[in-house]
């Protein structure tokens, strides 16, 4: 019997949204009795943008903004086509990007 794995990666700028989406998927997995490993928190990507406050003069006066990307990773063992179809139809919170990979 060939073992199939489904890897899901969640990304968002808000860590609460990522955690809600992961929780929703894990509830579905426990209802369908699917074995999984995770959620594994992946490193947070931090981007800093520096812009001038004034358009004209005052080069030393600058403002910095930060954007963080939070990521989580889950692997499902032998998910089955029914579970994959349920996941595809599941609505995730707005602002969460979900990536599927079947191995």
From Swiss-Prot:
Family matches, as Pfam families: Ribosomal_S10
InterPro entries, sorted: Ribosomal_uS10, Ribosomal_uS10_dom, Ribosomal_uS10_dom_sf
Biological process per Gene Ontology, one example term: translation
SUPFAM superfamilies membership: Ribosomal protein S10
GO molecular function terms attached to this record: structural constituent of ribosome; tRNA binding
Keywords assigned by UniProt, alphabetized: Ribonucleoprotein, Ribosomal protein
Gene3D superfamilies from the UniProt entry: Ribosomal protein S10 domain (3.30.70.600)
GO cellular component: ribonucleoprotein complex; ribosome
Domain of life: Bacteria
Role of this protein: Involved in the binding of tRNA to the ribosomes.
NCBIfam families: PRK00596.1, rpsJ_bact
PANTHER family in alphabetical order: 30S RIBOSOMAL PROTEIN S10 FAMILY MEMBER
Family listed: Belongs to the universal ribosomal protein uS10 family.
Quaternary structure and partners: Part of the 30S ribosomal subunit.
Protein name: Small ribosomal subunit protein uS10
Gene name per UniProt: rpsJ
